[in-house]
């Protein structure tokens, strides 16, 4: 039970000014008469016990018994032994010291009495049995001395040892008031652990402190320790939240929107093993190296076949003044790459836009988009050499109609729901989230440096079947193109656009037409022979007839075609390419001046 319950009756006396101020009592006997008029009945005691006030019942019973007795008998007697050695006893978990001088103070004495009354149920029962413990014997009053008569004390029991308390006097009204004041000032001893309901709530921590952190991304060398970081490239787009461990950082872009790409050296160009302060960088949009070059080119051809114009490029550079202030010699080395020269002692910035969607590489609807890579290769072009010195990559997903912002918001909501479901989850290693409305985290994405400087990127030029970048600004042409025929793919190169071949879809149809197949037989034969022309021209036809019938190709001088209406015409490349595929003919051979003359009669 608490000390608050122990002092309940005392608090009533202290806090009720009527008890002490309404009537001018001369001593405590008159003051207690008002309380004795309402005796402490058994019913009252039972109600107090039901409420858990056992100690208050014992204390009130003691006070009632004390003041109901004659004043002459209110003496606390003690044994003649005085302060003997038996006074130091361990009674009910309390060690009584022989020196009781501190009990002469009213405050300490009342505290001592209350603690013993409230802490010892056996002791309170003994008090109720004997009721001879006088308050005057316990509470000393200055100016009046009361001697302790010899003889055994009535407070003693068979299980209790005697001890001596100082002499006491009658306690007047003013002293009683001051005593209650001092008792109220002494904090009661806590006897139980306080209820958690009354504890001060601990300071609440943020729900997701790791998400609300808005500190900027550390520089690239700290993001990717152990990788070469002589150069540092950033893309001006927020970094995606959900990134798998070990993968390159990812950014969401809108189709056709220009984003700044910043290139710099952390040390300001100092300590770099370069032959010149100017380097050439190639910014390109490529597929991951896991895809073979043939598959990458197939994807690019499929994308280009669906574009409205042959001039449509994968990557574009904005014609803004800031580009030309920091970079020089901008060239479009391929449809998915551009190059420029910049000074390593200064920061370079270009604005690029990507014109393809991640879902443009499949004709099926609902297929997940293919992620692309934004790759930047930097070459040392000094002293007539072109040496690849640095490469960095980041993943990009391209959306249309502000889809990048919607994707970021969706990722934020997913991250929030995951955090709410698992508030104690620590799965935040490769993932960064955002909770606040409009919060986009870090507004830049750092490109991760790559250690593989050997793999050549696959670049796409529609009029070349295969092209691979060997040096910045140079492309390896396909067979049949000499180095002198190499076209510079600059932005202002109009001849290239004018001489550009039809779209890949039309090219595919033309390829089907170029595969010319003829069905021929002689008049004496009933079954046709198939003549597959290696090339859809007259030379291809002569070569096929020579191989089929064992004739020398150089001896075939004339080839004619006789229409159904009997018109005889000279066979030429145009007729073979456009009017002879899958056509059946009767083959008639004749000799003229030692040369072979062939007539194909249309059936």
Swiss-Prot record:
Cellular component, GO annotation: actin cytoskeleton; cilium; cytosol; nucleoplasm; nucleus
Note: GRHL genes (GRHL1, GRHL2 and GRHL3) show a paradoxal lack of redundancy despite their extensive sequence identity in the DNA-binding and protein dimerization domains and the fact that the core consensus DNA binding sites are identical. They have related but remarkably different functions during embryogenesis because of their differential spatiotemporal expression patterns during development.
Region ranges (Transcription activation): 30-95
Compartments (UniProt record): Nucleus
Keyword Membrane in record: no
Purpose: Transcription factor playing important roles in primary neurulation and in the differentiation of stratified epithelia of both ectodermal and endodermal origin. Binds directly to the consensus DNA sequence 5'-AACCGGTT-3' acting as an activator and repressor on distinct target genes. Essential for epidermal differentiation and barrier formation at the end of embryogenesis with TGM3 as critical direct target. Exhibits functional redundancy with GRHL2 in epidermal morphogenetic events such as eyelid fusion and epidermal wound repair.
Recorded phenotype for the gene knockout or disruption: Mutant pups display neural tube defects and don't survive to weaning. During embryogenesis, fail to form the epidermal barrier and exhibit defective neural tube closure and embryonic wound repair. The epidermis show a severe barrier function defect associated with impaired differentiation of the epidermis, including defects of the stratum corneum, extracellular lipid composition and cell adhesion in the granular layer. Embryos have thoracolumbosacral spina bifida and curled tail, and 2% have coincident exencephaly.
Protein name: Grainyhead-like protein 3 homolog
Residue ranges constituting the Grh/CP2 DB domain according to the UniProt record: 226-461
Species annotation: Mus musculus (Mouse)
GO biological process terms, semicolon-separated: central nervous system development; cochlea morphogenesis; ectoderm development; epidermis development; establishment of planar polarity; establishment of skin barrier; eyelid development in camera-type eye; gene expression
